[in-house]
From Swiss-Prot:
The keyword Mitochondrion does not apply. Residues 23-42 bind DNA. This is HTH-type transcriptional regulator TrpI. It comes from Pseudomonas syringae pv. syringae. The gene is trpI. GO terms for biological process: DNA-templated transcription; L-tryptophan biosynthetic process. Belongs to the LysR transcriptional regulatory family. It holds the Pfam family LysR_substrate.
Amino acid sequence: MSRDLPPLNALRAFEATARLNSVSQAAEQLHVTHGAVSRQLKVLEEHLGISLFVKDGRGLKLTDAGARLRDASAEAFERLRDVCAELTQSSADAPFVLGCSGSLLARWLIPRLGRLNADLPDLRLHLSAGDGDLDPRRPGLDALLVFAEPPWPADMQVYELTSERIGPVMSPRFAGYERLSHAPAAALCGEALLHTTSRPQAWPSWAQQHGIEPGALKHGQGFEHLYYLLEAAVAGLGVAIAPEPLVAEDLRAGRLVAPWGFSETPAHLALWLPNARRDGRAGQLAQWLKAELLRQPY
């Protein structure tokens, strides 16, 4: 019997997919495409010679073998994170490494970075976005700024900053702008709506809040990541749905409009850090972010 381990990238893709029960969410967390995660899962199944998932309606269900590997891989990765964190304990002089999605970084945090650095000069903030696993337990990451829904994991210290609000947005350059800008929300049922595979429930959830049957919506062009979705909306390619803070600058500049406003979701913008990685700077950062949101909401 071979004792060779499967490729590490394949194990990471499996561990994230099994933990989140979603290929799309695993892709978003690992900041790769849906297809890349699917390929790594196939590599792992071929290496082991067994099936780890079976189709369950529109989702996936772990096989018995998959459940065994999920438990083992979760324990192994957690142990690796703990040991690596112990080996790389930061001193007070080390930068504070904050992880967040590229979309949140580019569209919300960067416009405020000058004020943050001026108000917290000793923080020495280092931003981690783009490639990499944005799991807050990842070695080398001090905290994670993320939209997420409670309940929070027991091993996490979480600072809730504000409730998430989402809504449809479009550009004045969009061909349907004049027709839709003063129409009721139900008028969107006739549009091919821009959407992202990382948040497949965004449109259906919004529709239910507005008394619209989700099945009446028509999906148009899809995008792997939210950043590209919003770029498409700014370019006038259609109506997108987005968290309010990520389109705030575009709304102020007139590049986008939100005729139907924004609605709260169960999610929060929150700062996460593992309980085992207590750092007083996280509290300072959370206080600054919350004050910034109160001073200038989005």
